A protein has these predicted regions:
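Extracytoplasmic "Venus flytrap"
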Residues: 27-77, 92-98, 173
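Periplasmic-binding protein-like
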Residues: 30-34, 86-97, 114-119, 160-162, ...
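An alpha-beta-alpha
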Residues: 47, 139-193, 318, 334-340
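Short, well-structured alpha-helical segments in soluble
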Residues: 72-89, 106, 207-226
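Flexible loop/hinge segments that line or gate small-molecule binding clefts
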Residues: 106-140
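Hydrophobic alpha-helical segments within soluble ligand-binding/sensing domains
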Residues: 133-161, 175, 211-214, 281-291, ...
């Protein structure tokens, strides 16, 4: 009799657990915060794609302000607001602009159950990794090698580096710039720093874009007869930079700041590309259009949109955590497996800073630059 009673109780417990799991399966939500189309279309479209994939009943989205530096309280409020919904079990912020760390800290005071994921963070690694469960970013520093390798292959004489003080205070951007300087010196390339208007300042993005459109021709005149490559650290400046370079035979574009087939290329070249669709088809369409401008050998990027992938994998990882197939908050092996399945050839590593400190929940992703001649 006792054995039978024990068996009945065990079955009841299992049924109760199954019922709870079923409820979790039906009610779970992942919240995603991205930039707007003007500041980060890829992330915005990735959030839309997540809704299409998982359903609006499971994915909720919002955007942070374009002037996020002066409206940080709005960003914090939106992230914290997600946690007010008891069905939200994970939050993905990409780009993780300033305010993300403060919001995550606030959420952890009352909702320790929520998985917190930061993508493309604009707060330094030691800051954001202390607040987030998982951080993902394209490998900024290693791009100091890949960008300069591309420039060397092109026979570049001068590299113009556009940025502004806010970006040049960020650890990873500074690390990339330092490596670019070292490589430029070794390769005999002149690296020239040019300060552009910050698009989050009062004059806004349009002032930054206009500056680029006016400055590129001036730089080409200054370095007449030389091969000049241009790079800017800001997403919103990419369309202007690509456009300004297009009709300059000696101007080169090694990659966008967030390398991808979709980062400004569709707008610059007048292409109707499904952002985040068929990457190879997108690369072929870009190559064909660049050929019309005799510019196939003057542009490069990465073969896959890492920023979009961060959101896609962030949601997939979160779902695994919610349903229990991923047991820990920070499962590096599983995260690398998901990233490499989505982007074959991706190099995934933990970030280690200049002092030798490795952050075990901060993951960087690196791809090789493309040669558009391979897509003709």
């Amino acid at each position: 009799m006792k054995k039978l009673l024990s068996f009945v109780l065990a079955v009841a417990m299992l049924l109760s657990m199954a019922s709870f799991a079923a409820a979790e399966e039906g009610n779970w939500k992942v919240a995603i915060l991205t930039g707007t189309v003007s500041q980060g279309e890829e992330e915005f479209r990735a959030a839309e794609k997540a809704i299409a994939t998982w359903g609006a009943e499971h994915i909720i989205t919002d955007t942070y302000p374009d002037n996020f530096m002066s409206e940080m309280e709005t960003t914090v409020s939106k992230i914290v607001g997600f946690a007010a919904d008891p069905d939200v079990k994970a939050i993905v912020v990409c780009q993780a602009v300033p305010g993300t760390k403060a919001a995550f800290d606030k959420i952890k005071e009352t909702r320790k159950d929520i998985l917190l994921i930061a993508g493309t963070p604009q707060e330094d690694p030691d800051v954001i990794s202390a607040a987030a469960d998982v951080v993902m970013y394209a490998d900024e520093i290693a791009q100091g090698d890949t960008i300069m390798e591309t420039c060397a292959n092109w026979g570049i004489d001068v590299l113009i580096h556009y940025s502004f003080p806010r970006h040049m205070a960020m650890e990873l951007i500074v690390g990339r710039h330092t490596l670019m300087q070292q490589n430029a010196e070794a390769l005999g390339i002149e690296l020239v720093d040019v300060t552009a208007p910050d698009p989050t300042a009062e004059a806004g993005l349009s002032a930054s874009q206009q500056f680029i459109l006016e400055d590129v021709p001036q730089q080409m005149a200054k370095y007449a007869g030389k091969k000049v490559a241009f790079f800017t650290t800001n997403c919103g400046m990419q369309p202007s930079l690509q456009t300004a370079i297009l009709d300059q035979p000696n101007a080169y574009y090694p990659q966008p700041c967030c390398p991808s087939p979709y980062h400004a290329f569709p707008a610059t070249l007048g292409l109707e590309l499904a952002v985040g669709g068929d990457d190879e088809a997108a690369l072929k369409a870009i190559a064909a259009k660049l050929k019309d401008y005799d510019a196939v050998g003057r542009y490069s990027t990465w073969a896959s949109p890492v920023a979009m992938t961060i959101i896609e994998i962030g949601v997939e990882y979160a779902k695994g955590y919610i349903d229990g197939t991923i047991e820990g908050r920070n499962d590096g092996a599983k995260l690398a497996e998901l990233l490499q399945a989505k982007i074959p050839g991706a190099k995934v590593a933990n970030y280690t800073n200049a002092e030798g400190t490795t952050f075990d929940n901060y993951y960087t992703v690196l791809l090789a630059p493309v040669d558009f001649n391979d897509y003709l």
